[in-house]
């Protein structure tokens, strides 16, 4: 169960090695059956915590992708209106629940929320490039999280198998000791 640097995931999550020979593993790790159960339960809990944290992060990041798609669609519409030299009417928010209509003669620029209460004005092409780049970055993170979640699920399964191996080994050892004691009488 010793973790080495080459047995880590991309995010530094240690690999759980399958325990095939429980007795030699216990000897190597210098653990009793009870101590091994505690160690594996702790490891299992850590894996489950990391899994839930990654799932929450993946959900948050995945929710951003449709927002980028919508913004890109709007910018594409603005670019098309500008190319056709068409004006268009839109409604925009003045304050809570107060909207007004405006006619845009020739769209040239758009303002984009960057976060932390920062809005920046871009020309349409640069805005599209920025949003496309940001969408790609978010998609890359979602893909990485998907891969890491697959890895962590494998580690959880391996840890569960190891836990059952330890429990079964303990049961068999107690049965053997009981049989020896009953045979000695």
Swiss-Prot record:
Record-linked InterPro entries: PFD3 (IPR016655), Prefoldin (IPR009053), Prefoldin_subunit_alpha (IPR004127)
Chaperone as UniProt keyword: yes
Highest taxon above the source species: Eukaryota
GO biological process: microtubule-based process; protein folding; tubulin complex assembly
Its biological purpose: Binds specifically to cytosolic chaperonin (c-CPN) and transfers target proteins to it. Binds to nascent polypeptide chain and promotes folding in an environment in which there are many competing pathways for nonnative proteins.
Tagged with keyword Zinc-finger: no
Organism in which the protein naturally occurs: Caenorhabditis elegans
GO molecular function, one term: tubulin binding
Similarity-based family: Belongs to the prefoldin subunit alpha family.
PANTHER family reported in the protein's UniProt record: PREFOLDIN SUBUNIT 3
GO CC terms: cytoplasm; prefoldin complex
UniProt subunit comment: Heterohexamer of two PFD-alpha type and four PFD-beta type subunits.
Keywords: Chaperone
Pfam families reported in the protein's UniProt record: Prefoldin
Name by which UniProt lists this protein: Probable prefoldin subunit 3
């Amino acid at each position: 169960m010793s973790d080495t640097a080459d047995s880590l995931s991309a995010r530094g999550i240690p690999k759980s090695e399958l325990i095939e020979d429980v007795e030699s593993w216990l000897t190597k790790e210098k653990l009793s059956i009870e101590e091994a159960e505690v160690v594996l339960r702790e490891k299992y809990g850590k894996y489950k915590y990391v899994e839930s944290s990654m799932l929450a992060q993946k959900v948050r990041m995945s929710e951003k992708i449709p927002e980028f798609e919508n913004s890109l669609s709007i910018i594409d519409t603005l670019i098309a209106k500008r190319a056709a030299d068409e004006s268009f009417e839109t409604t925009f928010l003045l304050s809570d629940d107060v909207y007004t209509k405006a006619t845009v003669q020739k769209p040239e620029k758009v303002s984009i929320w960057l976060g932390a209460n920062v809005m920046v004005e871009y020309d349409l092409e640069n805005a599209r490039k920025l949003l496309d780049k940001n969408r790609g970055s978010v998609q890359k993170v979602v893909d990485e999280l998907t891969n890491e979640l697959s890895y962590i699920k494998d580690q959880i399964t391996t840890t569960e198998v190891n836990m059952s191996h330890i429990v079964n080994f303990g049961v068999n050892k107690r049965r053997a000791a009981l049989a020896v004691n009953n045979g000695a009488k």
